[in-house]
Amino acid sequence: MASEGSPDCCSSEPYAGASSCTTASFCPTSTTYLPSTCATSRCQTPSFLCRAHLPAGCLSPCYLTGGCNSPCLVGNCAWCEEGTFNSNEKETMQFLNDRLASYLERVRSLEENNAELECRIREQCEPDATPVCPDYQRYFDTIEELQQKILCTKAENSRLAVQVDNCKLAADDFRSKYESELSLRQLVENDISGLRGILGELTLCKSDLEAHVESLKDDLLCLKKDHEEEVNLLREQLGDRLNVELDTAPTVDLNKVLDEMRCQYERVLANNRRDAEEWFAAQTEELNQQQMSSAEQLQGCQTEMLELKRTANTLEIELQAQQTLTESLECTVAETEAQYSTQLAQMQCLIDSVEHQLAEIRCDLERQNQEYKVLLDTKARLECEINTYRGLLEKEDSRLPCNPGSTASISNSACEPCSAYVICTVENCCA
């Protein structure tokens, strides 16, 4: 039984014994209420009984919870003739019992929800609890394997590029050597063609001189022949008749003169030939020296150019390798940043979801704490009302021997089991 006590019996403060209780008591599910037969047949209160016959303790107003704080009179069941309470009061008591049972049931359900939420909070707050994340390890392994293959392929491509560049350098060397040899051959052929021209000119000069010598020899023979003919003709004309001796200069020996002329021309020809050979040898030696010096300079320039080309190609290959390595490292850094940003975003989403869940749990806990406080306050008021009603019943029971009337005794004996049953039920619920 429970109701809000009167201002004299129960204040608005919570019950003193409720401060030591942290959780609400459970009401057993086997609690039963009084049957309707007890309320109708055994606790009948006569409606014709006036208020003047009631004692002063029964006329004090008690404020019931189910009656919207409307005061009602609790009669003395030992003094009444047919029962302790009237029908309205019994209905109010039954309503209070139902309400107390519903409050206790609600307290039990809230405690279960509180325990479940505490378990969830404990599971969320455990240090070894790892967040559930999707397993991307096999994808990471595949990506790492593909990255290794890509790096190996890039290294192989770099090695092949170096080999191709080396082959190009060797081909350039052979091409430069071929070009140098070709230029030397062209120079030699040009020199040979020039010398052949000079040789042709000298041959022409020689043939001209030989033709001139032959013509001179023919002239000499003609002169000799003419002279002999003239001599013979004169001898035939003169015969032996005249022996003329002329005191003239001795005659010139034409053969000797011709021999001298021949020797002179031969000496001139030999001198010219020797001078031409010396000039040709000097020119050839000078050209050979110039060719050798030019070839040495050309070879040095070509060697220096090849060295510079080789150095430039080596530096270009190193630059390409460094650029490839830089690009691969930049790609690796970008992939790593993307991977860690994805993981960070996943972790942040997980943290946000957990924080949202914790905020919801805190809100639920605060709401349940408020409801729990309200229920504790209600329980304290109900216990205060129960104690008030128990005190009133005990007072009425203590007055029972002093009240006269056999009808009251019969009514007391008829209603006592009902009130005792209700008190026991409430005590079992609040134990």
Curated annotation (Swiss-Prot):
Residues 90-124 are annotated as: Coil 1A. One of its GO terms (cellular component) is cytoskeleton. One of its GO terms (biological process) is intermediate filament organization. Pfam families: Filament (PF00038). The record marks A338 as: Stutter. InterPro entries: IF_conserved, IF_rod_dom, Keratin_I. Keywords: Coiled coil, Intermediate filament, Keratin. Residues 125-135 are annotated as: Linker 1. Residues 253-396 are annotated as: Coil 2. Coiled coil: none annotated. Residues 136-236 are annotated as: Coil 1B. Residues 1-89 are annotated as: Head. Residues 89-400 form the IF rod domain. Residues 397-431 are annotated as: Tail. GO terms for molecular function: structural molecule activity. Residues 237-252 are annotated as: Linker 12. There are two types of cytoskeletal and microfibrillar keratin, I (acidic) and II (neutral to basic) (40-55 and 56-70 kDa, respectively). Heterotetramer of two type I and two type II keratins. Belongs to the intermediate filament family. May play a role in late hair differentiation. This is Keratin, type I cytoskeletal 40. The lineage of its organism: Eukaryota, Metazoa, Chordata, Craniata, Vertebrata.
